[in-house]
Amino acid sequence: MQIWVDADACPNVIKDVLFRVADRLQVQVTLVANKLLRTPPSRFIKAIQVPAGFDVADNEIVRLVQAGDLVITADIPLAADVLEKGGHPLNPRGEFYTKDNIQQHLTMRSFMDDLRSSGVDTGGPSAFSQGDIRAFANQLDRYLARQRSKG
């Protein structure tokens, strides 16, 4: 099991949480982005830079992810692809995308895209908060504890 990070849009504070977890639990964390990323020196942390372009980083994650891997992303279509490959997508606000909820997320995303394309100002997501960071860290810890107990 390893952790993949859709790093172009992942908040730095979430990356910091992942960096600490990588060293503490000796789990591989790989960031994928279309820009150069700075990572702390660690044999458990690496970054993959892909060419710029629409969904290039997402496609690389889908290509590399294995069943049982954790993928950190807020990108709903990427989360759907990860689920298809048996991965576990977790967004930076601490919500897992699952086979039970992914269709609802895809439908809402499509609806909001339609509103925006018709000129409606839908605003954006709420500001990232300390509560979001705690929710993410708690879900991450629970997930990793379950993985360790499986052996």
Curated annotation (Swiss-Prot):
Can you tell which superkingdom this protein's organism belongs to?
Bacteria
Q: What is this protein called?
A: UPF0178 protein mma_0312
Q: Which organism is it from?
A: Janthinobacterium sp. (strain Marseille)
Family affiliation: Belongs to the UPF0178 family.
**Organism lineage:** Bacteria, Pseudomonadati, Pseudomonadota, Betaproteobacteria, Burkholderiales
Q: Which InterPro entries match?
A: UPF0178
Q: Which PANTHER family match?
A: UPF0178 PROTEIN YAII
Instruction: Read off the HAMAP family from this record.
Output: UPF0178
